[in-house]
Structures are given as structure tokens and as C-alpha cells.
Amino acid sequence: MTMTLSVVAVTHRTAPVTIRERLSLPVEQQCQWLQRWGNQVPEIVLLVTCHRTEVYWLDGEETAHRGVEWLAELGGLTVEELERWVLQRSGAEAVRHAFCVAAGLDSRVVGEPQILGQVRRARDLARAAGTLGPILDRLFSCSLATGRMVRVRAGWSTGKRSLARVAVREAARLCSDLQSARVLVLGAGETGRDVIAALCRCQPAVVWWTNRSPGRLAQIPSEEPVRIVDWSEWPRLVTEADVVFVATNAPEPIVRLEHVTRHARLPRLLVDLAVPRNVDPAISDVPGIRVVTIDDLPADPVPVAAWDGVAVEPYVERAVQRYLRWLEARSIAAEIRAAHETLQSMLERELEKVLRLALRDPARTGEVKRVAAASMARKTLFPLFRALESEPQRVALALRLLAYDR
């Protein structure tokens, strides 16, 4: 049976954060969903980031609707509610999508480095869940290798391209004077650390940094001019800060309406970099406070010239074609194995007939051999003759190959 590779994706290009956050879930739950879906298809991988939730799978037929049903169930939505936000691809287009994602070409900030780690973790999680097979393993491994090479060739490996840098740049634009501002950062994951690094280049008046697990804060280089504070302090500091960046893994808002309405002094700007959102959307209605979500940030403020004139897309396309050729060769190899098994079974049956007849009448052994040989030839060539009218060139090639040893 021919396998079809498919992907369904809800991304920053297709859906707002209000939809994407419904499809965001912690690693433990991702593994559970993989194992649940893995009972239905031979191979499946789930990729979840703040910008996208994507399901890649292998099936015996083109069944993109199955992936939409999976995502709808995951997000507690109906298929009708979700399908307008879903990107669906299969075959070569699904492969091309995977390579573009890993290369950072489909990212909100083109070339951002986080996507490589996220794609790698998705592959490794599927392997741990027992849902990664040879086709998707090769797809993700090749796309990761291509993504790493693209970053080097395009000069993106310097680490200067990230959503955190965009967020700090946008905060500086909205505040007009970030250097005199007091800034609070909640979260010490990859995004939170990137925010701290970007802030240190701007030199605000004060930078407070806190995290629920203090151990992660201890990893910050000592030269960074940041005041590390206890997690219990942030509700007080949120009203003393001019700008607040929130980037935690909390599954629901942690900065709520009561945190900003109890006090006379309010922060001017709240930047929510989390999905699901960590800032209560109701705070947007409080006069004097501006809430910026991940969708409000500029898509990619870095000009195309930052690519240093490197033709990135053709390089990715060549990698896509290499994978597709491997996939085709693997498919043909499977067909050859199936044909071999069929022919072997047929030959064994004919030989059994020959042996039975030869034992009954040894004098007719030669005649029996000729009859059996003719029967085997007819059965071998019959499928080719049947396809002669629709695919004469392929049949001619097959016949030439069968006669190759003459």
C-alpha cells in the first residue's frame, strides 16, 4: 500500500492567538495525544510552539480531514470552528512545509533560532512515544540538517534574530525612553532569557527578573546588570514597573486584573510573549495600560538585506527534492519486495505441481517442466499485458529489464 505524508497546521499565518492558545499544551499531554493518535496511523509527530501547532502523519490514503478532527478534539473545538484556521498539505507540499518550518522561513521572525530546537524536541518526543517511524524520522532529521545549514549560509547563526529582540525593540518604540524605564521580566525560559539579553543592550534604569523556579535564574551570567528577585515579589513590582514582559509556561493568565487595579500607579506597557497568554485580556480595557500580545509585534522588522544576498529558498528546495527522491526510491524498493514475495510464492506453487506430477509419472518429467515453465511465464507477464494499453512505455521498460540477462 502506498503511504501518503500529510500535515495539518494552525500557525501565526493562519490563526490568531485566541485560537492557537487553545491548541497549546505541555509536553506531558503532547505525549499522551501522540500515543492516542498513534494507534490510528503508522507514524505521527506533533510540533507545538507559541506560533504553531502542527501534526505530521503517514497514512494509507490522503486523509487531511483526520488531522483537522484531531486538532479540533485537542482544542475542545468543533471541526467547523477550527477548519477555517487550518493549513492542510500532503505529499510533496507537506515535505516542503516541514523543511521551510525547520529552516525558519515560516517563522514570524524569519531565521529565528528557537525553531530548530522545537523541531528537534518534537521528533524526539515522537520517538519516546513510539510513534516515530523511518519516514518521519528521515523527514525531521533532513529538515533539521537543512535548517542548520541555512542558518550558517544566510548568516543567521549569530543569534541576533529572535522574537524577544523584536519585543524589546517594540517596547522601546512605544515607551519612547526605555533607558529611563523600570522593567520587570517574568519567566526564565528561552524567551525570558532572550528578553533579558536584549534589555541589557538597552540599559534600562532598572531590570527586575523573577521566575517560579529560582534555580533557572542562577544560570544568568554574573555580568548581566539585572536584579534577581523572589517570585513572591512580582505582584508588588508589577505596579512599580513601567514595562512588564511576561513569558512563562503557565497554562493560564498569571497577571490578572486585580494585580493592576488595586494600586494607583500602573505599568504603562505589558508585553505578553506567552501562548497560552499570561496576561488577562481584560487588562487591555484599563485606562493608561497598553497590552501587547505576541500577535501585535511586527512580523519581521529585519530587512531582506540581512540575508546577505544568499539564495536560501533554492537551497531548501534542493534538500526537499533529495528527500522526495529518497522517498520514491523507498517506495519502489517496497514494491520490489512485494513483487519478489508474489513471484516466489507463485514459483513454489508451480514447483509443487511439477514434483507431484513427476513422482506419479517420471517419463513425463520433461513435458511437465515445459508446461510449468509456460504457466509461470504467463502468470508473470499477465499484469504487464493488462497494463499495456494504459502505460505502454513503462511496460516496455519492464519487459526489457526482464530480458536483461539474455
Curated annotation (Swiss-Prot):
Subunit relationships: Homodimer.
Gene3D superfamilies: Glutamyl-tRNA reductase, N-terminal domain, NAD(P)-binding Rossmann-like Domain
GO terms for biological process, alphabetical: protoporphyrinogen IX biosynthetic process from glutamate
Entry's free-text remark on domains: Possesses an unusual extended V-shaped dimeric structure with each monomer consisting of three distinct domains arranged along a curved 'spinal' alpha-helix. The N-terminal catalytic domain specifically recognizes the glutamate moiety of the substrate. The second domain is the NADPH-binding domain, and the third C-terminal domain is responsible for dimerization.
Binding-site residues for substrate, renumbered to this chain: 49-52, 107, 112-114, 118
EC numbers: 1.2.1.70
Similarity field: Belongs to the glutamyl-tRNA reductase family.
Reactions catalysed: (S)-4-amino-5-oxopentanoate + tRNA(Glu) + NADP(+) = L-glutamyl-tRNA(Glu) + NADPH + H(+)
Any one GO MF annotation of this record: NADP binding
Function: Catalyzes the NADPH-dependent reduction of glutamyl-tRNA(Glu) to glutamate 1-semialdehyde (GSA).
Pathway(s) served: Porphyrin-containing compound metabolism; protoporphyrin-IX biosynthesis; 5-aminolevulinate from L-glutamyl-tRNA(Glu): step 1/2
Enzyme class: oxidoreductase
UniProt keyword NADP, yes or no: yes
Provenance organism: Thermomicrobium roseum (strain ATCC 27502 / DSM 5159 / P-2)
Note: During catalysis, the active site Cys acts as a nucleophile attacking the alpha-carbonyl group of tRNA-bound glutamate with the formation of a thioester intermediate between enzyme and glutamate, and the concomitant release of tRNA(Glu). The thioester intermediate is finally reduced by direct hydride transfer from NADPH, to form the product GSA.
Active-site residues, as the UniProt record annotates them: 50
PROSITE patterns recorded: GLUTR
Residue runs in coiled coils: none
Pfam families assigned: GlutR_dimer, GlutR_N, Shikimate_DH
Amino-acid positions noted as binding NADP(+) in the UniProt annotation, renumbered to this chain: 187-192
Alphabetically ordered keywords of this record: NADP, Oxidoreductase, Porphyrin biosynthesis
Keyword Transferase included in the entry's annotation: no
Positions of the record's site feature: Important for activity: 97
Name assigned to this protein: Glutamyl-tRNA reductase
